[in-house]
Design a protein with these regions (language model features):
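Intrinsic disorder in cytosolic terminal tails and internal cytosolic loops
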Residues: 10-15, 260-269
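12-transmembrane solute porter fold
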Residues: 70-266
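Hydrophobic transmembrane-helix bundles of small-molecule transporters
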Residues: 1-89, 97
């Protein structure tokens, strides 16, 4: 009966449902995202003409969504809610670093260190295990800032270790590097998810979570392009150190961004 009443109510308001859709906003958002991804995928040979197109599509998206009563992307809310926008930036940056290591380190283990794909997978296994353990611990932590700060510091420490690592490194060093990047993966995931939950408006939680996932995907795509840029046809010690330099600088920026974010002082909801 309740479902029937809901169906009858929906049937009586088809225009309301149609008005809540935003096909142009969806198209502009998709166009902006796809164009940005195409640029990021070719960082070795940048397609510079795509950048003006990204700017035009992004500007059109912002202009259109500001005038919608039910926008697909609430850009007005994002402009006003700097804490949430900062969380997206922090999440995307953290996963850019994590994906650089997750895929770039494994490739280096095979190409430069000479490990088989099976052995390289075993070396990377502690990274996944550490991430799983820290996800459980992070979910039970009341604060938000402390886990995210620890995650950023660990990413910086892991990057520093990679800078000192070469193809003659011992197995203990290789495993330590994997663990150092696995721990912050779990902490960053649960910490940023808690931040989104605390900072997003009550009625827009689903859209806010979707934008967080989008930030993570952009980080993954950028990481894949950077790996190709640093390694070329084959991973080397020099390529690993170049990657570690970039991830180290990003990690330091992440520490500053996290420590300086006053919005993270509030606990979880």
């Amino acid at each position: 009966p309740a479902a029937a009443r809901a169906a009858d109510a929906d049937a009586q308001h088809p225009r309301g449902r149609a008005a809540s859709l935003d096909p142009l906003g969806i198209a502009l958002f998709t166009g902006t995202l796809v164009t940005a991804m195409l640029f990021l995928l070719r960082l070795d040979r940048p397609l510079w003409w795509l950048l003006p197109l990204v700017a035009v599509l992004g500007g059109a998206l912002a202009w259109w969504e500001r005038r919608r009563t039910a926008p697909f992307i609430d850009v007005t809310m994002l402009a006003r809610n700097r804490a949430l926008a900062t969380t997206y930036l922090r999440h995307g940056t953290a996963y850019l670093i994590i994906y650089c290591v997750m895929y770039g380190y494994a490739q280096w283990l095979e190409d430069a260190h000479g490990l088989s794909s099976f052995t390289a997978g075993l070396v990377m296994l502690p990274m996944s295990a550490a991430a799983a353990v820290c996800s459980l611990l992070g979910a039970r932590t009341k604060g938000i800032r402390a886990p995210l700060t620890v995650a950023a510091v660990l990413l910086a420490a892991g990057s520093g270790l990679l800078l000192l690592t070469g193809h003659h490194a011992s197995m203990a060093v290789l495993l330590s590097a994997a663990v150092l990047f696995g721990l912050p993966q779990g902490l960053a995931s649960t910490g940023n998810q808690a931040a989104v939950y605390a900072q997003a408006p009550a009625g827009g939680m689903g859209a806010a979570a979707g934008l967080q996932r989008t930030a993570q995907y952009l980080g993954a795509i950028t990481a894949a392009s950077l790996i190709g840029l640093f390694y070329g046809p084959r991973a080397t010690d020099g390529g690993l150190h170049d990657m570690a330099t970039v991830t180290g600088l990003l990690s330091v920026a992440l520490v500053l961004l996290t420590v300086g974010d006053r919005a993270l002082r509030a606990g979880r909801r």
